[in-house]
């Protein structure tokens, strides 16, 4: 398997250069992505990186701390996806693209999505390495659609946008809806009318 060989090389390279912490996070992220967070352990991450448990515990106090780091990485991936999807767009087009990128992430990475929100809940302001919070493009779009874009973003409009988008994404990540379910576009369309009825 080419992907597994690549991961082994990446792990060895990361540790060789002294970046064991990043190697452990990468290993844990791949495990969560494929099998979920429940069956993972810090000792397993250490074995995967080819180091002792003691070496791993120098970077993470326990499994919970490692999984929090993985959740932060998951939010960074979501933010990157959102930024790419909304590049060059504004207003309603940005809002729609941002919402779909969020939903697409939940469909493509359901286990990472669930882990991220089990750790951070609705607080999507987490930033890492200069990457804006996962919800930033949705917030910017809501602000652009306000009657007076110069004013602070309307918290009620933002809450509505997040509640609808996150609700859809959660249903998809749990397997209750499919990404192409007609209710997805219907729910987005209705919520967008509530956010910017005249635009």
What feature does the model see in each segment?
Residues 72-96, 127-133, 138-140, 144:
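Amphipathic alpha-helical linker/stalk segments
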Residues 27-35, 77-88, 164-171:
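Solvent-exposed, amphipathic alpha-helical segments
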Residues 96-117, 125-132, 162:
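Helical hydrophobic small-molecule/effector-binding pocket
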Residues 20-29, 45, 70-74, 78, ...:
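Generic hydrophobic, amphipathic alpha-helix propensity
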Residues 118, 124-135, 145-192:
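Hydrophobic/aromatic-rich alpha-helical bundle segments in the mid-to-C-terminal region
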Residues 1-19:
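N-terminal intrinsically disordered/low-complexity leader segments
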Residues 32, 41-42, 63-74, 113, ...:
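Amphipathic alpha-helical segments enriched in hydrophobic/aromatic and basic residues
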Residues 23, 27, 31-65:
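Helix-turn-helix
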């Amino acid at each position: 398997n080419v992907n597994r060989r690549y991961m082994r090389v990446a792990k060895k390279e990361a540790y060789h250069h002294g970046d064991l912490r990043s190697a452990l996070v990468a290993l844990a992220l791949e495990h969560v992505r494929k099998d979920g967070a429940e069956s993972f352990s810090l000792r397993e991450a250490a074995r995967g990186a080819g180091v002792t448990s003691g070496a791993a515990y120098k970077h993470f106090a326990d499994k919970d701390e490692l999984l929090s780091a993985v959740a932060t990485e998951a939010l960074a991936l979501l933010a990157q996806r959102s930024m790419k999807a909304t590049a060059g767009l504004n207003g309603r087009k940005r809002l729609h693209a941002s919402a779909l990128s969020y939903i697409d992430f939940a469909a493509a990475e359901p286990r990472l999505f669930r882990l991220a929100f089990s750790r951070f809940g609705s607080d999507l302001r987490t930033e890492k390495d200069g990457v804006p919070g996962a919800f930033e493009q949705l917030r910017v779009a809501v602000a652009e659609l306000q009657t007076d874009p110069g004013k602070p973003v309307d918290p009620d409009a933002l809450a509505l946008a997040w509640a609808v988008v996150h609700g859809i994404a959660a249903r998809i990540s749990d397997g209750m809806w499919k990404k192409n379910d007609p209710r997805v576009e219907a729910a987005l369309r209705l919520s967008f009318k509530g956010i910017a009825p005249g635009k």
